[in-house]
Amino acid sequence: MTQTQSNHLILDFSHVYCDENIPRNDKLHWIHCSDIHECDLYCSDAAATEIHRRIDPYGTRGIHFLDSGNYHYVTKIMTDRIDEPFSLILFDHHTDMQSPMIEGMISCGDWARSVLLDNPQLQQLILIGPKKADIQAIYNDKEFTAKQKKRLKEKLIAFSAEELRADEGHEKVERIRMDVPFYISIDKDVLDERYCETNWNQGRMSLSLLEHLLRAFLETGNILVIDICGECQQGIPLPEYMEAEEKNAKTNRKLFEFLTHYIRRKSTIPRQKAPRHDEKA
């Protein structure tokens, strides 16, 4: 695989980033995806193969913008390319762990379930932001086999929106492994509507809390990729659309600047080899 110079990507499925007036520069490489069929909400094998082909030259590092939450399944395509043990940190108002609706297709609603159950390199999935009831629904899902339930119990660590607001769940932090690199995936629907407007119902997290939680991983962990999705709904009245786009563009810029600050800073610090999970630090 040949890796190009810029690892920061914009995957343009709906041209939403064009409407946000994101400047084109050498920091962000645009990958045009609007001509790919069978990829909105649900993604066929053919579409997944084509998406993989287009992102393959850019490696598995950097910050990637994935368009709206309809395309959040791209995170699965990205993580399928990782050839070393890793953990997925998922910020999302939804669990994205529904039972598959259409055989042979991944979707924005079930991709995380597929990563958890099927990716042999996944060590942990740290899910941050859904409602407590939605997290409990994962454990109550009767479609899991006994083997899948065991894997779920071993690998899933979930922090509900209620726990975050009450500053609870600290005991679960101790379970997070720090000896493997992190893939961080952010769906902006975890944020309150003051900060962005997405095409899905949203949580109530502040941008400052999201940055605080991200900082805990960015300062101490080895980060492979950070992806961001969650853009506004298409087809709404133009004044509402432009207002939403302005709000989303502002948050996208803030997140990009915040994340690149940590990436630049850590790139100047010699990386120390992390202890194995069975070793004492």
What are the residue ranges of the model-derived segments?
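Long, hydrophobic, well-ordered secondary-structure blocks that form the structural core
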Residues: 88-100, 111
